[in-house]
A protein has these predicted regions:
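C-terminal active-site rim and adjoining tail of enzyme catalytic domains
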Residues: 154, 161-236
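Asp-based phosphoryl-transfer active-site loop
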Residues: 1-2
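Metal-dependent phosphodiesterase/phospholipase catalytic core, i.e.
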Residues: 6, 11-159, 173-174, 179-182, ...
């Protein structure tokens, strides 16, 4: 969300010097620039779509094809596209980025949800949208403001190099406090919260919990499965 309350499509809370160029085409150097502290007009002066050479990103994604000169889009830019008749079969999985570990990088959940719902309603996409979040406060707020939009609960039960788990005993990410024994059966928790989708990290998937999710009528969305052997395991 920009300083002037415009939802954008961007993965991070800050502009990344390894991925972002300024209006002159130079790689930025300031690591502290938060989107929430920039107006959308200011954000639109930066370009993305390529990776700075010799960085960890460049080494990790050697085959990535750059799309130079791309701008950070407004959420409504995308909504305009999918609202066209030729894209009426497109269904949206919209993740709202919110965090408990960093201060002042987004508005509060109530405001974020309100701003995004306004755009969804404007383009009549309520029946074509699933909203997911790692921060379950967002999903609680969504249910309050519009219970008709599908809600997907993102879960991570192990720490990753770039992301810490959100499922653990008495986790604040989950809003309510759950004892350890209940966390082994996450679909039960999501069902009790009237969720629609369980969005689970692929290494946390078990056959027992997938079967339990299906029993509860929950769709299971697994992230992120790139290797063939993992794809086969997920299918099985």
């Amino acid at each position: 969300i920009s300083k002037d309350n415009i939802p954008t499509i961007f993965h991070d809370y800050r502009l990344n010097p390894d991925l972002v160029k300024d209006a002159s085409g130079n790689w930025i150097t300031d690591k502290s620039m938060k989107l929430v502290e920039l107006t959308y007009e200011e954000i639109s002066k930066y370009t993305i779509g390529s990776v700075k050479p010799e960085t960890k990103y460049a080494k990790r994604f050697k085959n990535q094809k750059p799309i130079k000169g791309e701008k950070i889009p407004k959420l409504t830019d995308f909504f305009k596209l999918v609202a066209e008749d030729k894209h009426k079969d497109v269904f949206l999985n919209l993740e709202i980025k919110s965090t408990l570990t960093q201060e002042n990088v987004t508005p509060n959940p109530e405001k974020m949800v309100s701003l995004i719902l306004k755009d969804i309603k404007e383009y009549d996409l309520e029946n074509r949208t699933l909203i997911t979040s790692y921060d379950w406060r967002i999903l609680y707020e969504l249910k309050k403001q519009n219970p008709n939009i599908l809600r997907g609960f993102i879960t991570l039960q192990q720490d990753l190099p770039t992301t810490k788990k959100n499922v653990y005993e008495n986790s604040p990410w989950m809003v309510k406090k759950y004892p350890m024994e209940e966390l082994f059966l996450l679909p039960n928790i999501i069902k009790s919260l009237e969720g629609h989708v369980w969005s689970v990290f692929y290494r946390d998937v078990t056959k027992q919990n997938v079967e339990l999710a299906h029993k509860h009528g929950l769709a299971t969305c697994v992230w992120t499965v790139n290797r063939e052997k993992d794809i086969i395991r997920m299918i099985e």
